[in-house]
Amino acid sequence: MRNTFIVCWQYLRAFALIYLCLLAGNAVSALLPFTIPGSIIGMLVLFTLLASQILPAQWVKPGCYLLIRHMALLFVPIGVGVMNYYDLVNQQFGPIVVSCLISTFIVMLVVGFSTQIMQRERATAGDRTPPKDNE
């Protein structure tokens, strides 16, 4: 019974922290003079808290695993909602495809160049060998 309470507490804590980051992102988004979705800002808040180790990753892991496991199911309402705008999507299909292709190409270029830079720096760092002691 105690183990069940611990597991429930871990899930509750994980979802509460994720939701608090979402609320913080929505609050910041409302204060900004330009439009950035609150969910994006909330993810950046969560990332910052995790990267700076203010928030232990173990606290949000159970909730993240559960959300990732059921991610396909979570996209169904969005897909159904898009069908309400079928005529608009059909009219704008060309620009949508072109923007998807261009953004995919840009992401591939950025990732490729970033990988090359990181590999070059790793090779340079690997070349530096400590001097051997002559005994």
Curated annotation (Swiss-Prot):
Annotated TM spans: 5-25, 30-50, 63-83, 93-113
Keywords for this protein: Cell inner membrane, Cell membrane, Membrane, Transmembrane, Transmembrane helix
Membrane association type: Multi-pass membrane protein
Pfam families xrefs: LrgA (PF03788)
Organism superkingdom: Bacteria
Chief location bin: membrane
Subcellular location: Cell inner membrane
Cellular-component GO terms for this entry: plasma membrane
Residue stretches in coiled coil: none
InterPro entries cross-referenced by the UniProt entry: LrgA/CidA, Uncharacterised_UPF0299
Family (UniProt): Belongs to the UPF0299 family.
PANTHER family for the chain: HOLIN-LIKE PROTEIN CIDA-RELATED, UPF0299 MEMBRANE PROTEIN YOHJ
Name used for this protein in its record: UPF0299 membrane protein ECA2828
